[in-house]
Curated annotation (Swiss-Prot):
GO terms for cellular component: cytoplasm. Its main location: cytoplasm. It comes from Sinorhizobium fredii (strain NBRC 101917 / NGR234). The lineage of its organism: Bacteria, Pseudomonadati, Pseudomonadota, Alphaproteobacteria, Hyphomicrobiales. Involved in peptide bond synthesis. Stimulates efficient translation and peptide-bond synthesis on native or reconstituted 70S ribosomes in vitro. Probably functions indirectly by altering the affinity of the ribosome for aminoacyl-tRNA, thus increasing their reactivity as acceptors for peptidyl transferase. This is Elongation factor P. One of its GO terms (biological process) is peptide biosynthetic process.
């Protein structure tokens, strides 16, 4: 464990609060006109997923847990969870669907991901910034419809809905941002 000042806490850090591990969801520094500056930290307890909000004085010491980020390859999903393999040691780790959250829709077999590991347990996952998916369903474009928004709804091959430009048709492969599920560009493959 490493002690750091609260103002240096960032999203994705893992904190040890009263012997329990929390992953930081957001951390904002506030400097009110009067009084001491504070850092508002929203966290999720790793053991059970409970969300907690804490306020620390910006100079207050908090314990940051030692977490190692290692590249792993996504293998498959089964009733046990999502299976990942370390390409160097061939060790396998399993993460539950709750730990992965909404990112599970973007996981593809063979995809390289970064796992945050604390004492041999995967506690967080970081996907590539972009994934390539196929459009399975989209509305036909209406000619002359330039006055309204230039994007139309589309359904991706992973079941996620997004908005795409009018020239994109069903069957087209597109690049999607994993952070928010937004359209980036047409795939170049």
């Amino acid at each position: 464990m490493v002690k750091v000042i609260a103002s240096s806490v960032r999203k994705g850090n893992v904190l040890d609060v009263d012997g329990k591990l929390y992953v930081v969801l957001t951390a904002q520094n506030f400097h009110p006109g009067k009084g001491t500056p504070v850092t508002q930290v929203d966290m999720r307890r790793i053991s059970d997923g409970v969300k907690v909000s804490e306020r620390y004085r910006t100079t207050e010491q908090v314990e940051r847990a030692f977490v190692e980020d290692r590249e792993h390859t996504f293998l498959y999903e089964d009733a046990e969870g999502f299976h990942f393999m370390n390409p160097e040691s061939y060790d396998q780790l399993v993460m539950s669907a709750d730990d992965i959250g909404d990112l599970k829709a973007y996981l593809q077999e063979g995809m390289a991901v970064m796992l945050s590991i604390h004492e041999g347990i995967a506690i967080a996952i970081d996907l590539p910034r972009h994934v390539t998916l196929e459009i399975t369903e989209t509305e036909p474009v209406v000619k002359g419809q330039t006055a309204s928004s230039s994007y139309k709804p589309a359904l991706l091959s992973n079941g996620v809905r997004t908005s795409v430009p009018p020239h994109i048709q069903a069957g087209t492969r597109v690049v999607i941002a994993t952070e928010d599920g937004s359209y980036v560009e047409r795939a170049k493959d």
